[in-house]
């Protein structure tokens, strides 16, 4: 009998977000093997959690999606709750007030999990930090599989999150680094777990010249893909780029792809291209010298994996524990610790294209050996079997 799997995630469908994209891709990959249903909110954006989708039963990519209204989005004075939860001498009540103020609070979603969660053999909860997971996991602990998408941030140190990491029947990690960090912090090795990851698919027809022609870019370019926002390290990226151009008088361009949530430098060597389709994104990757990624707190970066799968090196901050460690393991990335090192690494890649190709080839091999959908799906099926066996 096929497993019946419920996926609980804070947003689902045509929404921007790493965990949400991960969940949607996984659901599609599991469909041939399981009866999969999704429970989510009606929110489209993660900041306000404003109700944007229609509540009720929906279908996305042929999958039944139950959407429940957000009763409380992010509090207007959220920062006040955040400060209270992280100050010295705070209480557990302060921590739960922070979780509630962060949103999304969706009582009908939790009631669905409570009333119908045991109709499923496994319940996958995506992302540890939000209320649907914090309050949902304890409702079906014997069926819960947590996909924490965790990184070493202040919130994970709050006592209110301990039960989230100790209650599930199993945990599915994205990387070795995420697993090791969670085990160091929570000492929960006893819970069945695996480094499952996510699959990476790239087109064989990506064309860098097509991207250049479409956007009028000549000469070498470095690429950033993602939300252009302070929390992703973009101010540092822009400052480091200016330092690089001050010492490098060549024609290199920084191409920015994604939603802009902050000002972009008005420079002729910085091109903001806005959000692009997947096809255009892969064209951009095909033509770039390297991907630059400035985020520090990712549990996994899909764009880094996609760059490697396309045979491109990545330049990442040495202060990003997961990505810098993965870059070393893959032999496909160059971590920088300062603006000077950033500039030196970009110059190195421009001056030594053979090295860039070698790094990219190592990245392609790393992804092919680690992040393929057949392997990912089998690991999830094994976790489902583990949960099912323990509930007989």
Language-model segments: which ranges?
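Conserved donor-binding/catalytic core segment of Leloir-type glycosyltransferases
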Residues: 6, 214-232, 238-242
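A conserved catalytic-core segment of Leloir-type glycosyltransferases
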Residues: 41-117
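Donor nucleotide-sugar binding/catalytic pocket of nucleotide-sugar-dependent glycosyltransferases
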Residues: 143-154, 161-207, 217
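Nucleotide-activated donor-binding/catalytic signature segment of Leloir-type glycosyltransferases, i.e.
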Residues: 258-282, 290
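Aromatic "clamp/platform" in nucleotide-sugar-dependent glycosyltransferases that forms part
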Residues: 296
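Short hydrophobic beta-strand element within catalytic cores of glycosyltransferases
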Residues: 313-317
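Conserved acidic donor-binding segment of nucleotide-sugar-dependent glycosyltransferases
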Residues: 332-340, 348-353
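A short, well-ordered alpha-helix in the C-terminal region of glycosyltransferases
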Residues: 348, 355-370, 379
């Amino acid at each position: 009998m096929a497993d019946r799997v419920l996926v609980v995630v804070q947003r689902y469908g045509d929404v921007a977000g790493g965990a949400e994209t991960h969940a949607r891709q996984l659901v599609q990959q599991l469909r041939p093997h399981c009866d999969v249903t999704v429970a989510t909110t009606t929110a489209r954006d993660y900041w306000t959690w404003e109700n944007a989708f229609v509540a009720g039963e929906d279908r996305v990519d042929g999958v039944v999606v139950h959407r429940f209204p957000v009763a409380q989005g992010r509090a207007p004075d959220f920062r006040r709750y955040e400060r209270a939860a992280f100050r010295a001498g705070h209480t557990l009540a302060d921590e739960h007030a922070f979780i509630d103020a962060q949103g999304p609070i969706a009582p009908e979603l939790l009631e669905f999990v409570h009333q119908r969660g045991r109709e499923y053999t496994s319940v996958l909860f995506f992302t540890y930090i939000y209320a649907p997971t914090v309050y949902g996991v304890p409702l079906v602990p014997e069926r819960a599989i947590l996909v924490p998408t965790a990184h070493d941030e202040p919130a994970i140190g709050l006592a209110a999150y301990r039960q989230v990491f100790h209650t599930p029947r199993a945990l599915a990690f994205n990387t070795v680094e995420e697993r090791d960090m969670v085990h160091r912090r929570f000492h929960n090795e006893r819970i069945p777990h695996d480094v499952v990851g996510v699959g990476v698919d790239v087109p064989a027809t990506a064309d860098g010249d097509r991207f250049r022609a479409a956007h009028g870019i000549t000469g070498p370019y470095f690429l950033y893909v993602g939300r252009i926002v302070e929390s992703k390290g973009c101010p540092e990226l822009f400052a480091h780029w200016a330092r690089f151009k001050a010492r490098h008088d060549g024609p290199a361009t920084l191409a920015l792809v994604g939603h802009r949530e902050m000002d972009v430098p008005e420079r002729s060597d910085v091109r903001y291209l806005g959000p692009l389709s997947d096809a255009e994104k892969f064209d951009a990757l095909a033509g770039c010298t390297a991907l630059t990624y400035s985020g520090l707190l990712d549990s996994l970066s899909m764009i880094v994996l996609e760059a490697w799968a396309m045979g491109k090196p990545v330049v990442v901050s040495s202060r990003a524990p997961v990505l810098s460690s993965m870059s070393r393991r893959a032999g496909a990335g160059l971590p920088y610790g300062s603006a000077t090192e950033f500039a030196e690494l970009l110059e190195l890649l421009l001056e030594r294209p053979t090295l860039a190709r070698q790094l990219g080839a190592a990245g392609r091999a790393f992804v092919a050996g680690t992040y393929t959908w057949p392997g990912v799906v089998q690991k999830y099926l094994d976790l489902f079997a583990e949960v099912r066996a323990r509930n007989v």
